[in-house]
């Protein structure tokens, strides 16, 4: 066998090996995304959620307001601690939403393991002015009630509210770090605004 023939045979073998390896790499890379997408689809589901007209105090990592949510396959409301991405809630409005819910892999310990996104708003119904919302056993902590001098108003867990004529909001505010539990009654004023009607 001549030296030239030997070199040609080695070159041919090398070319075949390169093509074979390239083909394997291409096959593996195309299969992986397909499997990943299949898993993502399996973990995502669409649901219909009913959202109540008022938010409820709750405690996750810290004290906050939680939406009252009732999926269409459940009979009672439960508290939703996380966000609904793409949805802007307004107090005094009842909503029916179509949402997608998916699992979150490797979520932080203080975060939800589920991601909820707004798909569509099916209906919105506003409460009548004067509708009352009673929040029971509110634990008064430092950030439960905030008074903003610049805005000249109070906030309850981030939600602005006004004080009706005969309510002593100053006294209530002075109790915010005592840990006392109080019942708060808010009244709907229209345009997503609320006023504190009573506390005890």
What are these regions (language model features)?
Residues 65-76, 156-161:
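Short, basic/aromatic beta-hairpin or loop at an interaction surface
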Residues 95-104, 176-191:
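Flexible glycine-rich surface loops and low-complexity tracts that mediate binding to linear polymers
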Residues 104-115, 191-198:
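Short, Lys/Arg- and Gly-enriched loop/turn segments at beta-strand edges
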Residues 2-12:
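Bacterial N-terminal signal peptides that target proteins for export
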Residues 25-28:
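Bacterial signal peptide processing site
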Residues 76-87:
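N-terminal post-signal-peptidase region of extra-cytosolic proteins
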Residues 20-23:
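C-terminal motif of bacterial Sec signal peptides marking the signal peptidase cleavage site
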Residues 37-62, 130-148:
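Structural detector for short beta-strands of small beta-barrel domains
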């Amino acid at each position: 066998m001549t030296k030239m023939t030997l070199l040609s045979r080695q070159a041919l073998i090398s070319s075949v090996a390169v093509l074979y390896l390239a083909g394997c790499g291409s096959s593996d890379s195309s299969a992986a995304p397909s499997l990943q997408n299949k898993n993502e689809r399996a973990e995502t589901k669409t649901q219909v959620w009913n959202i109540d007209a008022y938010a409820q105090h709750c405690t996750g990592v810290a004290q906050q307001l939680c939406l009252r949510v009732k999926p269409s396959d459940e009979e009672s409301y439960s508290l939703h601690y996380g966000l609904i991405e793409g949805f802007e809630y307004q107090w005094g409005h009842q909503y029916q939403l179509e949402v997608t819910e998916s699992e979150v892999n490797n979520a932080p310990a203080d975060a939800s393991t589920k991601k909820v996104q707004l798909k569509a708003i099916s209906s919105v119904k506003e409460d009548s002015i004067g509708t009352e919302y009673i929040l029971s056993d509110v634990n008064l902590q430092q950030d439960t009630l905030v008074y903003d001098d610049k805005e000249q108003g109070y906030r309850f867990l981030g939600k602005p509210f006004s004080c009706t004529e005969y309510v002593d909001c100053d006294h209530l505010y002075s109790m915010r770090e005592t840990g006392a539990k109080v019942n708060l009654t808010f009244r709907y004023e229209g345009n997503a605004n609320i006023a504190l009607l009573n506390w005890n």
